[in-house]
Amino acid sequence: MASTERNFLLLSLVVSALSGLVHRSDAAEISFGSCTPQQSDERGQCVHITSCPYLANLLMVEPKTPAQRILLSKSQCGLDNRVEGLVNRILVCCPQSMRGNIMDSEPTPSTRDALQQGDVLPGNDVCGFLFADRIFGGTNTTLWEFPWMVLLQYKKLFSETYTFNCGGALLNSRYVLTAGHCLASRELDKSGAVLHSVRLGEWDTRTDPDCTTQMNGQRICAPKHIDIEVEKGIIHEMYAPNSVDQRNDIALVRLKRIVSYTDYVRPICLPTDGLVQNNFVDYGMDVAGWGLTENMQPSAIKLKITVNVWNLTSCQEKYSSFKVKLDDSQMCAGGQLGVDTCGGDSGGPLMVPISTGGRDVFYIAGVTSYGTKPCGLKGWPGVYTRTGAFIDWIKQKLEP
């Protein structure tokens, strides 16, 4: 049996022993050395689980998501056989800021998450982690993958017809990052469609709530999806919808109200520090969405693909035949036969996992801009707006 499975089995055995508040012994105040917590950059202490409310409360949650199970198992740092009771013996790596008295077992969004203002970007202790125009040749995601993915919902003028035409990524409690052409384009003008709302926490557009059956036969359902009306769209001032180059193809969508984070609704991280200037050449990245499949029909289920980033010079050589001139604010990825972003995935994130504080954190390296028609042509990568080139612009546009 794998170490992770053994650890979780041990933690599972104590669930039935937890009822209401966990009683702490004097030994629970002892630290067994420093450690690196699973979901925090700060240093942690190896302590009794009863001294770590964050993990003690999580232990009492049923049913647990796969990510919660993994977090619990990987957080265990030992056993203290000097004390009585299986619960009291478990040692976990707890971030210093999360130690203290045990709180109520009912899980609720943290105060920090619930009250975060629109001009505040979350740290990588909150954003970019998993509790998995255009996806072509993709595979299904799991129910919990990419919780920052959103659908942009459009309403036709003088009609009650709604459609999902673009994707995007949640940046914080109030803003979504998407492509400029998702807010201004000839196609939108012709169709008479206007951006109306944003859907969060979606996986399968045919069902609400979304449910999945695990290998052990247990059926788990996510909360119902959330539709929030748009307060305003902010298109980059230098974006020209009719330009063949499609530079500055980036936009922000401000929601009418703040959204609280959950396992199924969570922001992705913006590039920071050295990632801002990184062009990510030869990196493998993930793209996800509900766009057209190889059958040229929108996918009901969120799909994902893995693409490799091209050298910009090589990409320019491909697109020069279309008189396209790429610059450093753009990047290219993909080009594998039958694997591409496609109609409906525009505005979605190009995601790169970076090991941070002992876990993978997803950053939004790019925003889906455009590609070839038909999608998925061998040797033709898709073009993305490079997010790192617009960090200052994004921060300037955020409001409380």
Curated annotation (Swiss-Prot):
Enzyme Commission number, as recorded: 3.4.21.-
Keyword Endoplasmic reticulum: no
Gene3D superfamilies reported for this sequence: 3.30.1640.30, Trypsin-like serine proteases
UniProt source species: Drosophila melanogaster (Fruit fly)
Chain positions carrying an annotated carbohydrate: 140, 311
Protein name: Spaetzle-processing enzyme
Post-translational events: Proteolytically cleaved in response to Gram-negative bacterial or fungal infection; processing is likely to result in its activation. Cleavage produces a light chain containing the CLIP domain and a catalytic heavy chain which remain covalently associated through an interchain disulfide bond.
Deletion consequences: In larvae infected with Gram-positive bacteria, fails to induce the expression of the Toll pathway-activated anti-fungal peptide Drs. siRNA-mediated knockdown results in increased susceptibility to fungal and Gram-positive bacterial infections, failure to cleave spz and to induce the expression of the antifungal peptide Drs. RNAi-mediated knockdown in the fat body causes increased susceptibility to fungal and Gram-positive bacterial infections and failure to induce the expression of the antifungal peptide Drs.
Gene it is expressed from: SPE
Keyword annotations from UniProtKB, A to Z: Calcium, Disulfide bond, Glycoprotein, Hydrolase, Immunity, Innate immunity, Metal-binding, Protease, Secreted, Serine protease, Signal, Zymogen
Gene Ontology terms describing biological process: defense response to fungus; defense response to Gram-negative bacterium; defense response to Gram-positive bacterium; innate immune response; positive regulation of antifungal peptide production; positive regulation of antimicrobial peptide production; positive regulation of biosynthetic process of antibacterial peptides active against Gram-positive bacteria; proteolysis
